[in-house]
Amino acid sequence: MYDSLDFDALEAAGIANPRERAGLLTYLDELGFTVEEMVQAERRGRLFGLAGDVLLWSGPPIYTLATAADELGLSADDVARAWSLLGLTVAGPDVPTLSQADVDALATWVALKALVGEDGAFGLLRVLGTAMARLAEAESTMIRAGSPNIQMTHTHDELATARAYRAAAEFVPRIGALIDTVHRHHLASARTYFEGVIGDTSASVTCGIGFADLSSFTALTQALTPAQLQDLLTEFDAAVTDVVHADGGRLVKFIGDAVMWVSSSPERLVRAAVDLVDHPGARAAELQVRAGLAYGTVLALNGDYFGNPVNLAARLVAAAAPGQILAAAQLRDMLPDWPALAHGPLTLKGFDAPVMAFELHDNPRARDADTPSPAASD
């Protein structure tokens, strides 16, 4: 079975106990890895990980910062900054670190910079790096939990871990294709959304801002096991995503147990808040959601939103009682027929003067107006 392996040569090259690890070494040999590649992996303490690691790499490191800069027509400092904004590091300015694929990817950024300007292009790198880092962490957590054999601490068997890791890593290019497809759909959705909220060529938009969170979340984290907390947050995130999208909104971000979203109209903003607070899943789990809402002109930058309406909505959700929706006065004025009770004035952090708010309730008439009648459906 191991006739093709020269154990003495492998041991002399630096691979410890090759005969005891014959199964792993044969597996790597059958995958086409050279002795040199195995030795390098052994030096990194990752011989068991070589089969999967190679599928994660973008290619052999052939460019230093200086040679990559020459290839791209940039300074080495610009290349280093771009790589840093992506959340990535290089071993040193003169150490080959970047692959051909890395440099080709940066060439796309260089071309984009010429189209949209330096600030926009650098901002995109920051967003991309943050998003990819979060995605990578989510994937890693998913794989560790769903395929425990990927961990040596679980199997205590290098060959079993190598096979499991390889099977998981083979999804990397397929997930890349999935990302490309989903990205295209989200670009089309974002274009449609922004067409409804932009007023000029600036980055400012006029829209509704919503925040919602789980009441007494700190107490929940102390009462639940990690597994129960994971299930709770997973279900909450899924419910929020479904509700916001169903009501025509766009998710901006999750912050622990809180979510921020934007809506193109006051009606859609409030409908999403009502559906979140009254969500049957939350009631079944005996959870209480609260929300804070505002409407106005904000700065849309790098996938996030900034401005007074954002600050106001964030402060209102913090002031809301469990199961309560607090809306800014301007939003209330835009929905005169929506059931509301005056609440305030409130003293909110960051606001010099007390702020008038309104507690909003469900509006069955608005819901009925959104639902086609049987006759209209025929």
From Swiss-Prot:
Superkingdom to which the source organism belongs: Bacteria
Q: Give the organism, scientific name.
A: Mycobacterium tuberculosis (strain ATCC 25618 / H37Rv)
Q: Member of which family?
A: Belongs to the adenylyl cyclase class-4/guanylyl cyclase family.
Q: Which residue numbers delimit the Guanylate cyclase domain? A: 208-317
The protein's name is: Uncharacterized protein Rv2212
InterPro entries the UniProt entry points to: A/G_cyclase, Adenylyl/Guanylyl_Cyclase_3/4, Nucleotide_cyclase
Q: What is the lineage of its organism?
A: Bacteria, Bacillati, Actinomycetota, Actinomycetes, Mycobacteriales
What's one GO MF term for it?
fatty acid binding
Query: Which Gene Ontology terms describe the biological processes this protein takes part in?
Result: cAMP biosynthetic process; intracellular signal transduction
